[in-house]
Amino acid sequence: MDLLLAARDGAKLAASLFEPATPNGHAVLLNSGTGIPRQFYGAFARHLADRGFIVLTYDYRGLGGSEKLRDATMEHWGRIDQPSMIDHLAALAPDGSRAVIGHSLGGQILGLADNIGSLDAAVLICSQSGHWRHWPAGRRRLRMLALWWLLIPGLTALTGHFPGAWVGTADLPSGVARSWARWGRSRYYVCDAQGAPLRPHNADVAFPLRWMSFTDDPIAPLGAVEALRPYYPNAAVERLHLAPDDLGTDAVGHFGFFRKSMPRRAWDEIADWLENRLRQTGRISSSKEISACPNHTSSPKSKTASAG
């Protein structure tokens, strides 16, 4: 079911709700990567729903079907959009166990949400620090330097937005692109406009956290992933750095885990882990209907799409 949900500040955010035929009492929010439309995660979300989870995916402001706000920044994504969706997830499963799955940026911003501590578990896929020094010396590091200092500032100034085709994503609003580049230039990565680190609620991430990265991912190399780990000092982290063979496939990269071609055993492993961890909370959900904006759109089944 496709919905249009209100953020805390009134911004309208497009979302998709995947409802299980046989609920297991658990609900999952999916935080997407930078510039990745929620439909890209549809097959994965539907698989989790088939396993009994309520799943909510959404587009950050300025992207996909969400309200096109030109002044949107990454701070808005983490401090308003994300906690708003956690609120909606709580409305779906007020007495149930709840988790977040973060892809790339979606795992970097957990500590920006003032209600992140209301969740019971998290899974991070390819989440890393984007600071350029964490890339191996040589051509790959030079590309990151060019992205943060030249490509994003230059193209954003020229076009009024960042053409996402340069990095394989959707176009980014100018404010989002500029804040992303600011983060990438800072050794703190997630930082405010003055360059100070933003870690307002990172200590509240004090639950089981499964963190996966892949040997063939050029966008989240091992050093960059490990650099993000200190952001969550109170989490019970389970780290997995896997080769594609470990998942029964030839390639994963930065986006492949969520593609329809991913062997279902990899998705089942995530579902099994979530079930085991969330069951330990001892909470059982009674599903409730989520409230949408008056001009919400809905369809009998959520659409799914593959990005490549």
Per-segment meaning from a language model:
Residues 1-19:
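N-terminal cap/lid segment of alpha/beta-hydrolase-fold proteins
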Residues 32-36:
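Active-site glycine-rich loops that stabilize anionic/oxyanionic intermediates
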Residues 38-69:
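Conserved alpha/beta-hydrolase
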Residues 40, 72-92:
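Alpha/beta-hydrolase active-site loop
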Residues 101-188:
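Alpha/beta-hydrolase-fold enzymes
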Residues 205, 211-213:
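Short beta-strand/loop motif that positions the catalytic acidic residue
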Residues 221-231:
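Short alpha-helix in the alpha/beta-hydrolase fold that links the catalytic acid
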Residues 238-296, 301-308:
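Catalytic active-site module of serine/aspartate enzymes centered on a nucleophile-bearing elbow/loop
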